[in-house]
């Protein structure tokens, strides 16, 4: 069996289902969006545009991309090449991209995934929402769109229900977006004048790390530097501050780049075969298990006999089934994952 042809067939099957059931994202203002796609690479081509929803769906059904992206920006000339200056950008969605690396608990290479790094990505998404977006930015849960990225991350879109506020946010300049990113990453944190948001966050972190450290003098004090320098525990406090600043792994380019592309919601991720899945809110996010909930269930009913001859030792668990380099039978879900990670194998039959 031709492996690449079979993979393409599976992607086409999924997109037929997604379009028939109206779950594939139709980006707002579709005629003003740039699209990109890839097969063996993330982006083989971009500067693609569609006049309407029908043209968009027809293209997806015909091409069944393994990686599929839309621009966050709205453009007058989305199909023009030559960078942002050529595209006539007049508006841009605001989204954060959490993209974690492997954790200390992970036993795999950095390009692999497991329950530990997926759990860390989830925890970081919850932390971003509960520690920044709601208390510091004044947003409600209903103002956010939470999307599993299809790999080790989450996309958090800022979508205020108040149209006037949304108009303001989606008109932010690159400098405005950079300020938000720097605030969350603590890059503009000044210990001589700590604002209420970071004060609350750091006090909570200190108490969680070491209950022996008294935070009473810090709770109503802006000038933390002055107080900390006179404490015996100052080195430990400075370490906790740095750890707290580095608690979220955000892809800064998603905020910086005017013409950044983000994966189309309910497309498939070409490295994993997992669904780029939207979640209804924090409750679903807390329950969410990508290794089960981001899998196209029809793929679990397709089983292939394989010969895996890759030298690397690996293991992946999908929908409760474990696969490794000794596996002789794999589901279509596992097939897409192994193919996306360049594991060497041949299909014998299905």
Curated annotation (Swiss-Prot):
<comment type="function">
    <text>Catalytic subunit of DNA primase, an RNA polymerase that catalyzes the synthesis of short RNA molecules used as primers for DNA polymerase during DNA replication. The small subunit contains the primase catalytic core and has DNA synthesis activity on its own. Binding to the large subunit stabilizes and modulates the activity, increasing the rate of DNA synthesis while decreasing the length of the DNA fragments, and conferring RNA synthesis capability. The DNA polymerase activity may enable DNA primase to also catalyze primer extension after primer synthesis. May also play a role in DNA repair.</text>
</comment>
<keyword id="KW-0479">Metal-binding</keyword>
<dbReference type="InterPro" id="IPR002755">
    <property type="entry name" value="DNA_primase_S"/>
</dbReference>
<dbReference type="GO" id="GO:0046872">
    <property type="term" value="F:metal ion binding"/>
</dbReference>
<dbReference type="GO" id="GO:0000428">
    <property type="term" value="C:DNA-directed RNA polymerase complex"/>
</dbReference>
<protein>
    <recommendedName>
        <fullName>DNA primase small subunit PriS</fullName>
        <ecNumber>2.7.7.-</ecNumber>
    </recommendedName>
</protein>
<comment type="subunit">
    <text>Heterodimer of a small subunit (PriS) and a large subunit (PriL).</text>
</comment>
<keyword id="KW-0464">Manganese</keyword>
<comment type="similarity">
    <text>Belongs to the eukaryotic-type primase small subunit family.</text>
</comment>
<keyword id="KW-0804">Transcription</keyword>
<dbReference type="Pfam" id="PF01896">
    <property type="entry name" value="DNA_primase_S"/>
</dbReference>
<feature type="active site">
    <location>
        <position position="97"/>
    </location>
</feature>
<keyword id="KW-0460">Magnesium</keyword>
<dbReference type="InterPro" id="IPR014052">
    <property type="entry name" value="DNA_primase_ssu_euk/arc"/>
</dbReference>
<dbReference type="GO" id="GO:0003899">
    <property type="term" value="F:DNA-directed RNA polymerase activity"/>
</dbReference>
<keyword id="KW-0548">Nucleotidyltransferase</keyword>
<dbReference type="InterPro" id="IPR023639">
    <property type="entry name" value="DNA_primase_ssu_PriS"/>
</dbReference>
<keyword id="KW-0240">DNA-directed RNA polymerase</keyword>
<dbReference type="GO" id="GO:0006269">
    <property type="term" value="P:DNA replication, synthesis of primer"/>
</dbReference>
<keyword id="KW-0862">Zinc</keyword>
<keyword id="KW-0235">DNA replication</keyword>
<feature type="active site">
    <location>
        <position position="99"/>
    </location>
</feature>
<keyword id="KW-0639">Primosome</keyword>
<feature type="active site">
    <location>
        <position position="251"/>
    </location>
</feature>
<keyword id="KW-0808">Transferase</keyword>
<dbReference type="GO" id="GO:1990077">
    <property type="term" value="C:primosome complex"/>
</dbReference>
């Amino acid at each position: 069996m031709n492996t690449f042809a079979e993979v393409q067939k599976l992607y086409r099957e999924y997109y037929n289902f997604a379009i028939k059931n109206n779950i594939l994202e139709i980006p707002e203002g579709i005629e003003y969006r740039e699209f990109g796609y890839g097969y063996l690479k993330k982006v083989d081509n971009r500067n693609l545009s569609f006049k309407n929803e029908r043209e968009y769906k027809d293209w997806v059904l015909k091409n069944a991309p393994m990686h599929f992206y839309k621009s966050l920006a709205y453009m007058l000339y989305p199909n023009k090449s030559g960078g942002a200056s050529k595209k006539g950008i007049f508006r841009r969605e605001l989204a954060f991209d959490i993209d974690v690396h492997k954790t200390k608990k992970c036993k795999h290479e950095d390009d692999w995934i497991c329950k530990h790094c997926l759990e860390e990505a989830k925890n970081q998404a919850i932390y971003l929402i509960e520690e920044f977006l709601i208390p510091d930015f004044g947003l409600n849960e209903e103002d956010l769109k939470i999307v599993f990225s299809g790999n080790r991350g989450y996309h958090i879109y800022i979508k205020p229900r108040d149209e006037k506020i949304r108009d303001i946010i989606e008109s932010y300049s690159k400098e405005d977006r950079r300020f938000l990113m720097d605030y969350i990453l603590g890059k503009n944190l000044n210990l001589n004048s700590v604002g209420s948001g970071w004060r609350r966050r750091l006090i909570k972190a200190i108490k969680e790390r070491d209950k022996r450290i008294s935070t009473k003098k810090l709770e109503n004090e802006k000038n933390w530097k002055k107080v900390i320098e006179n404490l015996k525990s100052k080195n430990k406090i400075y370490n906790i501050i740095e750890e707290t600043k580095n608690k979220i792994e955000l892809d800064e380019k998603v905020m910086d780049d005017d013409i950044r592309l983000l994966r189309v919601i309910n497309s498939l991720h070409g490295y994993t075969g997992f669904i780029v899945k939207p979640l209804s809110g924090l409750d679903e996010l807390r329950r969410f298990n990508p290794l089960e909930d981001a899998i196209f269930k029809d793929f679990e009913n397709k089983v292939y006999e394989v010969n895996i001859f890759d030298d690397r030792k690996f293991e992946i668990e999908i929908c409760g089934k474990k696969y490794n380099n000794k596996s002789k039978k794999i589901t279509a879900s596992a097939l897409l994952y192994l193919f996306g990670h360049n594991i060497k194998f041949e299909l014998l039959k299905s």
